[in-house]
Amino acid sequence: MIHFILIQNRQGKTRLSKWYTPYEDVEKRKLSHEIHKIVNSRETKFTNFVEFRTHRIVYRRYAGLFFSVCVDPTDNELFCLEAIHLFVEVLDAYFGNVCELDLVFNFYKVYAIIDEVFLAGELMEPSKHVILQRMEFLDNLP
């Protein structure tokens, strides 16, 4: 199960976060800061999986953004990496070469995409084509 999703830039600013497990605001900020310190300091030759407290962080870097997912230690890490990649592919197809500013200024659309891909901390829709069709439908609503 996915506990939370964080999208952070290299400077540590959280550009987007989605929490599937309830945390206090102070704890959310602390987790975001700790995770950024961990993933930002790792070399590219290391694996994209990190043990973190009682969970596991699976992350992937795209350009200047870190996409981090906190999962149970029993979850399949490669599946999580592919879920992150699917999410980024959908963002890229939807926005056309997505960048950090797209996430900042169109955050409500990014949250809609997250809600189409993930439901209650689980991958809901594995088809990029279906997700993009749903987003097109939402865009055409009056």
UniProtKB/Swiss-Prot annotation:
Subcellular location: Cell membrane; Membrane, Coated pit
Signal peptide range in chain numbering: none
Pfam families, alphabetized: Clat_adaptor_s (PF01217)
GO biological process: one example: protein transport
Thylakoid found in the keyword field: no
Key words of the record: Cell membrane, Coated pit, Endocytosis, Membrane, Protein transport, Transport
GO CC terms, sorted: AP-2 adaptor complex; clathrin coat of coated pit; intracellular membrane-bounded organelle
UniProt superkingdom: Eukaryota
InterPro entries: AP_complex_ssu, AP_mu_sigma_su, APS2, Longin-like_dom_sf
Subunit structure: Adaptor protein complex 2 (AP-2) is a heterotetramer composed of two large adaptins (alpha-type and beta-type subunits), a medium adaptin (mu-type subunit AP50) and a small adaptin (sigma-type subunit AP17).
Family of this protein: Belongs to the adaptor complexes small subunit family.
Function description: Component of the adaptor complexes which link clathrin to receptors in coated vesicles. Clathrin-associated protein complexes are believed to interact with the cytoplasmic tails of membrane proteins, leading to their selection and concentration.
PANTHER family (UniProt xref): ADAPTOR COMPLEXES SMALL SUBUNIT FAMILY (PTHR11753)
Protein's recorded name: AP-2 complex subunit sigma
